[in-house]
Amino acid sequence: MSKKALLIIPPERFNEDELFQPKEVLENTGVAVTVASTKTGEITGDYLGKALAEVIFSEVSASDYDAVAVIGGSGTNDHLWGNQELQSFLKQAHEQKVLVSGICAGSVTVAKTGLLSGRKAACYPVDVQIDELKANSVEYAKQHVVAHDDIITGDGPDGAKEFGESLAAALR
């Protein structure tokens, strides 16, 4: 049975590299990828790239997936950081032994759940994100990917392919 990953993007302004590079890596290793958001339909990225959100994350069961990833982009700060429904979804996924991950601003979204408290994480190297990690008792690590057994975080576009490879390796 093939592995399944749910990639969650904001309803606008996702980062194209952070979605498309990991998605391609996962699909090339046989992982079935579903793109989710807070709405379905076509979503425009930070650089006008287009993605199709097939499902609303809150309408699917985390346990149907082997991995859940929160993708970054300027819309992630605005729409996903404070989304209580998403935080509950990620905590539930973690409880059900689903691999939880985030890249760039998505790492901060994961940190806000408390799941990374006392641990290291990667995020985009800007103060607003690093400060949010610290505010959630997470130690910032200046590297492309930080992989724990249960949670993986990535820094952003430069580490997007490596983030995808880390997810794929964890799902093998």
Predicted regions and their residues:
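Glycine/proline-rich loop-helix segments at beta-alpha junctions forming the active-site rim
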Residues: Y124-V126
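Extended, subdomain-level signal for the structured scaffold at the beginning of enzyme domains
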Residues: M1-V100, T109-S117, I130-R172
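Catalytic nucleophile serine of serine hydrolases
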Residues: C104
